[in-house]
A protein has these predicted regions:
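Ubiquitin-like/PB1-type beta-grasp interaction modules and other compact soluble beta-rich domains
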Residues: 1-65
Length: 66
């Protein structure tokens, strides 16, 4: 299935969860915020949210600085 990830098309296995996407992108353990179709999804729900074709997923990484 195809989703839009940070504005770019990306093909994923059907039913992939947000957490599985984070692992596939090798981003686990990082400070991230995820939104699906402009709705922020709390980290504790990432295993429960299965992505659907044409979902728009935005991943934002927190970067410390001064």
């Amino acid at each position: 299935m195809e989703i839009v990830l940070n504005g770019a098309p990306r093909v994923l296995p059907p039913g992939q969860t947000l957490n599985e996407l984070v692992v596939a992108l090798q981003l686990e353990g990082q400070a991230l915020a995820l939104a699906v179709n402009r709705s922020v999804v709390p980290r504790q729900r990432w295993d429960d949210v299965a992505l659907q074709a044409q979902d728009r997923v935005d991943i934002v990484r927190a970067i410390g600085g001064g």
